[in-house]
Amino acid sequence: MPKRRDILAIVLIVLPWTLLITVWHQSTLAPLLAVHKDEGSDPRRETPPGADPREYCTSDRDIVEVVRTEYVYTRPPPWSDTLPTIHVVTPTYSRPVQKAELTRMANTLLHVPNLHWLVVEDAPRRTPLTARLLRDTGLNYTHLHVETPRNYKLRGDARDPRIPRGTMQRNLALRWLRETFPRNSSQPGVVYFADDDNTYSLELFEEMRSTRRVSVWPVAFVGGLRYEAPRVNGAGKVVGWKTVFDPHRPFAIDMAGFAVNLRLILQRSQAYFKLRGVKGGYQESSLLRELVTLNDLEPKAANCTKILVWHTRTEKPVLVNEGKKGFTDPSVEI
């Protein structure tokens, strides 16, 4: 049997700890209980005698709406007279994930100052879905459309590398820029071809804003590699390409890996992407060789060592149950 003094020693050790834990629980829970009590009957929200309670509900809703407007929807940033405008050219086409991808992209572009979004649909007319989405973003945008001929469209799920994607849409955007701005325009700007299935760092847009002729940087998840990049020497000049697929292309670079000064686009009016007679992977070269030489390229992103754009692509949804047992509602826009 334990001795009496052993029991006393245990009590003297346990009792102080019990008291400490009890006090701590009371100090922690008391404010929470007070908060819940206040939520149940907040004296500050009691309707004064003779007042209409509906007026107070409306006032609360107005306050919430003001907060939402001021802190959530105050985008894009105010326009600056000193920053060059970034003209982002995005070809797009109708598919289940189109709205999701354009929404994700818009949420990025809303944080970029002095940005103009040129969205070009591969369609015979501008679709209501894209028109509503662009209008609701609050971005400075232009909505165009041109349909790719049937013989240049993909058939089924197979990807034919000989068939260029988005070429006519990008070319229409180039034509729009040349028709909108005079050839000798002093308007400072940069043109960037940004597909809607990529992920973009905000830092990328500030990197490209200072483009004098053509700036370049790495792109992740392309060419079967973690990333492809321009090869830059110790003097900071582009001397080649870090890629496996046809590294001897004139410009072995992804569409998301370069930006062009607007004045260069306006001055070289013959420069377009080639639709015919161009092998897969040569679309970028077909435009850039009309604008610059390798020696003219300006490496960005810490001499092409930082990844600021990823060719992520949205997973194609598996809609095998769509239309079964009355679950389909075509009126719901996705």
UniProtKB/Swiss-Prot annotation:
One of its GO terms (cellular component) is endoplasmic reticulum membrane. One of its GO terms (biological process) is chondroitin sulfate proteoglycan biosynthetic process. The record marks E228, N321 as: Interaction with galactose moiety of substrate glycoprotein. It catalyses: 3-O-(beta-D-galactosyl-(1->3)-beta-D-galactosyl-(1->4)-beta-D-xylosyl)-L-seryl-[protein] + UDP-alpha-D-glucuronate = 3-O-(beta-D-GlcA-(1->3)-beta-D-Gal-(1->3)-beta-D-Gal-(1->4)-beta-D-Xyl)-L-seryl-[protein] + UDP + H(+). Residues 1-6 are cytoplasmic. Residues 245-254 are annotated as: Interaction with galactose moiety of substrate glycoprotein. The soluble form derives from the membrane form by proteolytic processing. It comes from Homo sapiens (Human). Involved in the biosynthesis of L2/HNK-1 carbohydrate epitope on glycoproteins. Can also play a role in glycosaminoglycan biosynthesis. Substrates include asialo-orosomucoid (ASOR), asialo-fetuin, and asialo-neural cell adhesion molecule. Requires sphingomyelin for activity: stearoyl-sphingomyelin was the most effective, followed by palmitoyl-sphingomyelin and lignoceroyl-sphingomyelin. Activity was demonstrated only for sphingomyelin with a saturated fatty acid and not for that with an unsaturated fatty acid, regardless of the length of the acyl group. InterPro entries: Glyco_trans_43, Nucleotide-diphossugar_trans. Pathway: Protein modification; protein glycosylation. This is Galactosylgalactosylxylosylprotein 3-beta-glucuronosyltransferase 1. GO terms for molecular function: galactosylgalactosylxylosylprotein 3-beta-glucuronosyltransferase activity; metal ion binding. It comes from the Eukaryota. Residues 3-5 are annotated as: Essential for transport from endoplasmic reticulum to Golgi apparatus and interaction with SAR1A. Keywords: Endoplasmic reticulum, Glycoprotein, Golgi apparatus, Manganese, Membrane, Metal-binding, Phosphoprotein, Secreted, Signal-anchor, Transferase, Transmembrane, Transmembrane helix. PANTHER family: GALACTOSYLGALACTOSYLXYLOSYLPROTEIN 3-BETA-GLUCURONOSYLTRANSFERASE 1, GALACTOSYLGALACTOSYLXYLOSYLPROTEIN 3-BETA-GLUCURONOSYLTRANSFERASE BETA-1,3-GLUCURONYLTRANSFERASE. Signal peptide: none annotated. Belongs to the glycosyltransferase 43 family. Its EC number is 2.4.1.135.
